[in-house]
């Protein structure tokens, strides 16, 4: 398996397929109310919080599409030193389609969701889920690490050479279609009661004044 994975990466990292998944095409065709963040480039880390739906597509041509007029929803999008942060605390999820080339870390908190479209071929990937966040990740990696906290839920598919995981007491991980040459899974200590939304006791009107 080790030989096949390295062969895969040699091909994948040399030539990345530029065709995008159908989920992105459909979203563009069916919804013209979006903002294309063309200035966002070279992103290696993505953090989302609140109620954000993130769809990841591996693409040599990076771009980020934020749907449903995020300015009107007072969502926050920040980029600094290769890290992209997106937050939205409205009842309806803010959808973001991210075309990324070599992301190495993704983190979701509150009730946010992460989904990959198509295959991802990466050397290293770190996935962190907090609160009640969920993720469906399909990737082939050399090193994969996950930290699943609160009541979050992670579904993994694909393969890795080395898998390291920290799993919270109430968190869940599905790995029916996932294989690892080496794995190390540990249980995280219970520190405090999780919150599905850390801002649930703050009124939306107050949050809007912050932006």
PLM regions with names:
Residues 1-130, 134-149, 153-211:
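Intrinsically disordered, low-complexity terminal regions
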